[in-house]
Amino acid sequence: MSKPKIYIALCSFGKDSIATILLALENNEPLDRVVFSEVMFDHERGISGEIPEHIEWVYNTAIPKLESMGVKVDVVRGKLDYVTLCRRKLKSGKKAGQMYGLQSARFCYANSECKVAPINAYYKQFSKEYDIVKYVGIAIDEPKRLARLEGTNKVSLLAKYGYTEKMAMAKCEEYDLVSPNYRGGEFRGGCWFCYNANISRYVNIRKNYPHYWQAIRDLYYETNTKAFKYGKTLAEVEREMDSLEFNQRNQLTLF
């Protein structure tokens, strides 16, 4: 006997996942729940790994608005946070006993343990009773990503209704559900502490959330790692940040 289906949308609160939810509502597609996995930088201090402006918008604007439309939103977090992962010690090899340190381009354990693991645990609670259909935000103009959905339990409503990424953004704008991550036409999603982040993001964090940047500095020196983009040291990254801030100030004085 087949199990009943449960329809769950995986949502990052970016344009594609929000547009997916809106299309489901507009077209009476089955939608039982929405799940958002929040990466945590430090549970103890209550520091999220999400871009500060984005996570504030998620909790204060996006979730309340979706819930007012009848959408059930579940937030999950991993048992481990980024700080804990960085402090874990290697058990074997030449570096046994040393801390893992900051994530690197070679291995992003923050994604696997802080984001993916809690999502998998969330799905597991339904898997015995239901066949899970997962709505994912992949637009019709992303053919390679869509091809990977074949033969899985993942469904793209954006593709079903012929939505491109540009159309997904327009749908979010229609409902006034656009994350601050898209300000200025540039998407700035992902974790604020990511090794691969551009310098302007770090400048924004240091300027507006100095205790966040200090937390990264402390962790960098505590774990004795060099794990910024292209293997740059913290000193090299901060010199680039200082240079960018200097140039930004000079541009402002011209006007």
Model-identified regions with their sequence ranges:
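Nucleotide-activated chemistry modules centered on ATP-dependent adenylation/adenylyltransferase
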Residues: 1-255
